[in-house]
Amino acid sequence: MDYKTILNQSSDLLKNFSIKSARLDSELLLSSSLKISRENLLLNLNKEIKPNQQKKFKSLLEKRTKKVPVAYILGYKDFWKSKFLISRSVLIPRPDTELIVEEALNYLPKDKYKKILDIGTGSGSILIS
């Protein structure tokens, strides 16, 4: 089975579980299973998936059908310009939180050292970004 076929099938499956980001989630989980970037995955949709890779992908996909967030499945989340390790003990950084980082950087002087107190940082994504 090629990458395109398995992506289409998995995306349809996730849609049946009312997962709105079905295609994106499928791409992220498959690229992780293949140990390649999402970009590389999308550039090689005609490539065949190996049985061990397909088994790994099915395992990740099953977790997603149980509504486990992709960041918890993969153990990381891209936020701002970095990749953050994520576990169930921290909140997942949200895309709209990146606006807070942007606004803070616009507000703070660019040429001065910044001191910020962040209590209960969780993943630390806001503070580090």
Each language-model region and where it sits:
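A residue-level detector for conformationally permissive "hinge/kink" positions
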Residues: E27, S59, I73, K114-I116
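A short N-terminal interaction module
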Residues: M1-Q53, F57
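A general structural signal for well-ordered alpha-helical segments in protein cores
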Residues: L7, S26-E27, F57, K67-V70, ...
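Conserved SAM/SAH cofactor-binding pocket of Class I
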Residues: E98-S129
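Conserved AdoMet
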Residues: S32-Y107
